[in-house]
């Protein structure tokens, strides 16, 4: 009986292995190839979406292909892109930062108030502002890493605290563009325009592109970048491999704060004036998360790239500009972006499910 039972179990096991082999072979067809490609290169989806959008909007309005149109899109998404870079490195660690917009606006207020209220040279107030932004990011990181509080709750709280401090400290006063140009022109440096052929480009666009290139290199080609991915993918395994998770998290949130400070400096150049009530304090959070999600970075951490975020930010700019040139209602932009967000998260879930 034991022999017959063993033969029966061996037969079932053999058939199961054949079935699994057939199933795996089937999965490695077209669907399997798509899954493997997207898992390895998550920015492919936003790249395809952007190319299709450019083709469609170009067919609707040939002026969309003008070089000047691209330069305008880059100027529009520059600030969001820098905030998106800050958001991306946090989300790669399986966190989220809801305070990026508030830190950016408060940085502009600090630079403005130190220049006009205390009479400190603009070059020094810029350093003070970015350092303050880094400190705000450090506080987020310390609360998340050392006290092990949920990133969502921590940054939701600091978002409110920073926004309130922003209005209290500034007394809700706006510093006019002409006053900044006359007395603290260095604050508007990134708004300087130069021409490349027919395109009008600001230094702020260059700052955005350089920061994206630097962070893309750091995350893909340095040990620190690999540690960021490791902490987001599997923090326990990362610690077993010798990665100091707490230190990496604090560094990530601090760097995110510094990037928000740089975004604040660029924003002064883009808009000219300094206003504590700037809408970016609220919208910056949503826009940065949108660029990250559409760009293929997983909200669960450990997967994605800065290049994907860059493409996600461009997609938002392309849709806004394309629909505006087509004469469509602005609400269509929000509708289509919402669809893209849901589609991006759905694709991410599919990739994670199949990979599991």
Model-derived segments and spans:
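Hydrophobic alpha-helical segments embedded in the membrane of multi-pass proteins
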Residues: 76-87, 102-106, 160, 209-213, ...
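Transmembrane alpha-helical segments in multi-pass inner-membrane proteins
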Residues: 14, 254, 260, 271-338
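Cytosolic-side transmembrane-helix boundaries in multi-pass membrane proteins
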Residues: 2-53, 240-247, 270, 319-356
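Inter-helical junctions in multi-pass inner-membrane proteins, predominant
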Residues: 60-72, 167-173, 218-225, 249, ...
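Short loop segments and helix-boundary regions at transmembrane helix junctions
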Residues: 33-38, 91-96, 117, 135-179, ...
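Single transmembrane alpha-helix segments in multi-pass membrane proteins
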Residues: 55-118, 122, 142-148, 289-307, ...
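Transmembrane helix-bundle core of multi-pass membrane transporters
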Residues: 152-155, 159-221, 248-251, 271-281
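Helix-loop-helix "hairpin" substructures at the membrane interface of multi-pass membrane proteins
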Residues: 120-129, 135-140, 144, 197-275
């Amino acid at each position: 009986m034991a022999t017959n039972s063993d033969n029966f179990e061996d037969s079932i096991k053999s058939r199961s292995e054949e079935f699994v082999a057939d199933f795996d072979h089937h999965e490695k067809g077209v669907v399997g190839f798509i899954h493997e490609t997207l898992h390895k290169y998550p920015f492919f989806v936003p790249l395809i979406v952007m190319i299709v959008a450019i083709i469609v909007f170009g067919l609707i309005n040939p002026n969309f292909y003008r070089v000047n149109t691209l330069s305008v899109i880059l100027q529009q998404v520059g600030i969001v892109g820098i905030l998106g870079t800050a958001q991306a490195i946090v989300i790669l660690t399986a966190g989220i930062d809801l305070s990026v917009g508030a830190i950016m606006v408060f940085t502009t207020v600090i630079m403005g108030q130190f220049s006009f209220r205390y009479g400190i040279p603009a070059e020094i107030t810029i350093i003070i502002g970015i350092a303050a932004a880094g400190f705000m990011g450090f506080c987020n990181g310390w609360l998340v890493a050392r006290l092990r509080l949920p990133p969502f709750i921590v940054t939701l709280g600091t978002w409110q605290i920073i926004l309130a401090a922003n209005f209290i400290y500034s007394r809700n006063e706006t510093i006019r563009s002409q006053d900044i140009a006359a007395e603290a022109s260095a604050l508007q440096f990134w708004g300087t325009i130069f021409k490349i052929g027919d395109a009008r480009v600001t230094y702020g666009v260059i700052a955005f592109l350089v920061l994206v290139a630097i962070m893309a290199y750091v995350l893909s080609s340095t040990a620190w970048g690999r540690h960021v991915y490791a902490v987001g993918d599997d923090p326990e395994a990362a610690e077993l491999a010798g990665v100091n998770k707490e230190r990496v998290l604090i560094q990530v949130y601090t760097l995110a704060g510094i990037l928000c400070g740089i975004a604040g400096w660029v924003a002064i150049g883009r808009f000219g004036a300094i206003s504590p009530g700037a809408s970016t304090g609220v919208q910056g959070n949503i826009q940065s998360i949108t660029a990250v999600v559409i760009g293929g970075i997983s909200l669960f951490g450990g997967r994605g790239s800065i290049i994907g975020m860059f493409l996600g930010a461009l997609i938002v700019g392309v849709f806004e500009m394309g629909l505006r040139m087509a004469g469509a209602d602005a609400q269509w932009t929000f509708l289509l972006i919402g669809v893209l967000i849901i589609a991006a998260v759905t694709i991410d879930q599919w990739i994670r499910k199949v990979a599991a």
